[in-house]
Amino acid sequence: MKEGLRVILSGGGTGGHIYPAIAIADEIKRRYPNAEILFVGAQDRMEMEKVPQAGYEIKGLWISGIDRSFSLKNFIFPFKLMSSLSKSRKIIKKFKPDIVIGTGGFGSGPLLRIAISKGIPTLIQEQNSLPGVTNRILSKNASIICAAYEKVKDVFPAEKTIITGNPVRQDLLKVDQLREEALEYFQLSKDKKTVLVLGGSLGARRINRLIENDLKKFKDEGVQLVWQIGKLYFDEYRKYDSATVRAKEFINRMDLAYAAADVIISRAGAGSVSELCVVGKPVLFIPSPNVAENHQAKNAMAVTEHDAALMITEDELTERFEPCFFSLLQDERRMNRFAANIKKLALPNATSDIVDEVEKLINNKV
């Protein structure tokens, strides 16, 4: 590997695209402490805050997705795209990267397109079981694709698609050793079951309403909650914070949140699914319906088809949530079976395997 490695990572919009990119950057830095790493994301999105918190520089592009319903915002999309392509060209010219890595999200498309046009090695990290339109287009000319699901080879060029799994935070590999610390951190009772509720980094309105409506039921069942409400809804629901309901806008110590949990209620974003497989706890997935091509439901089904989790769609929640979820809480054998089966789906070395592919690409270039 050459001295002075220079890497651009691009991805964002949601935590599911940001945290894999940060995990890859951390592994590159671990192997090559002198590496220069630059992030590129969508301006005004959460990556502009989360990436600097992780210790990396980031530049923003004026870019967003296309609204799938009719919207006036779509009329300015071509101007955003042209602006982002122009800025991406300038960023690449100035930074001179050895490789460009895209983890999905609005910002990665323009940057990868310019990198490909200039013959710079490119790696796409596809988290979902159903790839988005941008990655489908870019995959034809990208150097390599690292994916989490075997079925994406039906969409991507199979000869350059490698199944590595999704990058996960390395601190999640030891959550089974952190139970006592986790209960103390969240000030929870060791004598009650703990349910962790995750609605994604921004929050999930339907999940928050569900939990609000069932707070008495949780209390009656002797269950305590760690409830990640999300940035968009925290002011509305923070009033429920109590000794048995730990209401949080955002959870910085996810390793401890997972360690405290007996059962987890979660969206089914690709990054979350990968983390939950590594953690190995029983899960109820409530996929977001507000995503392209219903990919969260497909991510969840890739787990449930192995008898490794439950899934309830938002349309089914009113009828099915209480009987399904609370019967699971009382069924230790089923909880243990789900935990064992979901753990079998984990690919805990994904981050390392992806950086191995980065090294191969750069070594082939030199």
From Swiss-Prot:
Membrane topology according to the record: Peripheral membrane protein
Compartments (UniProt record): Cell inner membrane
Organism domain of life: Bacteria
One GO term (biological process): cell division
Entries under InterPro entries matching the protein: GlcNAc_MurG (IPR006009), Glyco_trans_28_C (IPR007235), GlycoTrans_28_N (IPR004276)
Entry-linked CDD domains: GT28_MurG (cd03785)
Assigned keywords, A-Z: Cell cycle, Cell division, Cell inner membrane, Cell membrane, Cell shape, Cell wall biogenesis/degradation, Glycosyltransferase, Membrane, Peptidoglycan synthesis, Transferase
GO terms assigned for molecular function: UDP-N-acetyl-D-glucosamine:N-acetylmuramoyl-L-alanyl-D-glutamyl-meso-2,6-diaminopimelyl-D-alanyl-D-alanine-diphosphoundecaprenol 4-beta-N-acetylglucosaminlytransferase activity; undecaprenyldiphospho-muramoylpentapeptide beta-N-acetylglucosaminyltransferase activity
Manganese listed as a keyword: no
HAMAP family, per the entry: MurG
Protein family (similarity comment): Belongs to the glycosyltransferase 28 family. MurG subfamily.
Protein name, as recorded: UDP-N-acetylglucosamine--N-acetylmuramyl-(pentapeptide) pyrophosphoryl-undecaprenol N-acetylglucosamine transferase
Encoding gene per record: murG
